[in-house]
């Protein structure tokens, strides 16, 4: 299986965490896996590696630039509350606990970058005979070597997508949008190019603003549910559908055997915390917290 890993970082974050993340992939992922790093308007750093390639996102995705220019001065499209004449509006029923607040949940401009990184990789990587593209957030850290068969088993041939879902099949409550710090896109699936095109169209047509939330994980969830229900597309949910527990589903899943995800406050802490973990039901992760890396992390988030 020919695999490409992609990530992106915004200006000012290379030294903070992205460099550590990218270096950890190059050091601990199997030889032969290409790493594409998308950058957003800034000059790329000077870290060179034969398997790493920098891509100017704005240069290769002009439709992204058009979308961002169209909405850059609209506070609502950037997650804020102030409405302007002719601007976009949140749906009246949107928000839940965040209703009436500024929130990343509606920051369409910020999170469009990630979407267009992924769609560019899907559209262009198949031409170079790649089998799958794996998105990995730039605030992850691969703390030990990953076997190739582990990655290949995560991305089965019959599934279009592998992701960390947060829909609990036992509760049947509709669930929550996935954790998209890791997503595998199967380039050999007959619907994957349509998926990428439809994802971009939600932004180029401004249809994204018809959804309850506008960040990439929610939009991904919205579109993947359409493909699952209307096109009967198979997906590989390695999160709640596999019995994983906890809000920090990334480290509680089998990915936690090799990778940490420093979401939010964890960036300042330098790792996830012991109280992020929940009892493990799956045999492959029974001894997860006994790994040397997890033994050394702080007990709680501060």
Q: What are these regions, as identified by a protein language model?
A:
Residues 143-208, 213:
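Conserved catalytic core of nucleotide-sugar-dependent glycosyltransferases
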Residues 106, 110-164:
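GT-A fold catalytic core of metal-dependent nucleotide-sugar glycosyltransferases
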Residues 103:
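Short acidic-hydrophobic catalytic motif
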Residues 20-24, 119-120, 217-226:
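Short, hydrophobic/amphipathic alpha-helical patches that form generic packing surfaces
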Residues 12-16, 108-112, 211-214:
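Conserved phosphate-coordination/catalytic loops
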Residues 182-301:
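Catalytic core and acceptor-binding pocket of nucleotide-sugar-dependent glycosyltransferases
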Residues 18, 115, 139, 180, ...:
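Conserved glycosyltransferase catalytic-site signature
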Residues 1-100, 123-129, 187, 262-269, ...:
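N-terminal anchoring/stem segment of glycosyltransferases
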